[in-house]
């Protein structure tokens, strides 16, 4: 690793406001926001160093573990699962699923232009296909059919500034009966009155949209740069029709 990172530990910053300075071995200093993923992915190892190690992001591990555990509880092994990974980034979630025995195909999608390049650089061969763009622009039906997909996953992809409820439901309904859903989302999604996405999740929990929610747990997603915890929920569900 030919860089070090200085985190801005100012209190009270929103997730999208957190900043850092990357100091390279040649003396260059690069200032960026944490959510400038394109700039993060351009530096090999930077995302893992900051998000996974320094800020202790647990979403990929929690999502993968919860999904595989629920599959086992329902008498299914993970090996044949074939996954559409939404907001796939440089492949951290896909790698965690692979480590837990998912041997089927992974298809990634991300709206960050540099994500696919970073995923192939950091985790070569993990994805059989990697699509650039918004989920709403993707023909999910054709992708599901082409790769015979049986799972939809997304770590942190749901919430304000990310995928809308209607867009997500349009994608989820293209999956076959018995398909698995695994997502993590900020706790505010479930706790805010009048939130479209929160109302959608509530409908899923009530058995709506041909979905059975079988796990919904709160967990510490990661630390803020100032040290306070950020909490998310992990949801595991199945398609019933």
What are these regions (language model features)?
Residues 84, 90-140:
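Class I SAM-dependent methyltransferase SAM/SAH-binding core
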């Amino acid at each position: 690793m030919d860089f070090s990172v200085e985190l801005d530990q100012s209190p009270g910053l929103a997730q999208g406001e957190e900043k850092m300075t990357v100091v390279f071995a040649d003396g260059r200093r690069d200032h960026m926001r944490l959510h400038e993923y394109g700039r993060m992915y351009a530096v090999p190892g930077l995302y893992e160093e900051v998000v996974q190690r320094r800020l202790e992001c647990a979403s990929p591990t929690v999502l993968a573990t919860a999904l595989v555990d629920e599959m086992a509880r329902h008498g299914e092994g993970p090996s044949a699962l074939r996954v559409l990974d939404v907001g796939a980034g440089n492949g951290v979630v896909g790698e965690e699923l692979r480590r837990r025995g998912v041997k089927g195909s992974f298809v990634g999608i991300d709206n960050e232009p540099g994500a696919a390049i970073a995923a192939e650089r950091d985790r070569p061969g993990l994805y059989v296909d990697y699509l650039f763009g918004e989920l709403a622009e993707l023909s999910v039906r054709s992708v599901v059919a082409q790769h015979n997909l049986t799972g939809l996953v997304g770590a942190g992809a749901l919430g304000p500034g990310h995928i809308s409820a209607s867009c997500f439901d349009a994608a989820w309904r293209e999956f076959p009966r018995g398909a698995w859903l695994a997502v993590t989302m900020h706790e505010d999604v479930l706790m805010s009155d009048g939130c479209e996405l929160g109302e959608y999740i509530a409908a899923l929990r009530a058995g709506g949209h041909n979905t059975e929610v079988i796990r919904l747990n709160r967990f510490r997603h990661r630390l803020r740069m100032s040290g306070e915890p950020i909490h998310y929920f992990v949801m595991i569900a199945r398609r019933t029709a």
